[in-house]
Amino acid sequence: MVYAIVRAGGRQEKVSVGDFVTLNRVPGGAGSTIELPALLLVDGDKVTSAAADLAKVTVTAEILQDLRGPKIVIQKFKNKTGYKKRQGHRQELTKVKITGIK
């Protein structure tokens, strides 16, 4: 089984060909392809982690859609002063399909 650890959207993800991964928003529209930098490559028993070898490895992904994550609510409260603050946030996300590890 071939898989790679890639840096994507500020995080590290374990991916293999055919996987669907949700990342922080990546520039580009639906249908475009992106390349993700590999940090580690595992091909059966062979593990590649040297930077010179990983520079030759490309992990390609196709952007499927841009979406937004679930809403989270942030609340602040100070006792005895009447201070209350409420704020919501929805993270911008991108769903991609890993198309190749070469």
From Swiss-Prot:
Note whether Thylakoid occurs among the keywords: no
Cited Pfam families? Ribosomal_L21p
Q: Which UniProt keywords apply?
A: Ribonucleoprotein, Ribosomal protein, RNA-binding, rRNA-binding
Which molecular function terms from Gene Ontology are attached?
A: rRNA binding; structural constituent of ribosome
Known partners and oligomeric status: Part of the 50S ribosomal subunit. Contacts protein L20.
Q: What does this protein do?
A: This protein binds to 23S rRNA in the presence of protein L20.
Write the protein's name. Answer: Large ribosomal subunit protein bL21
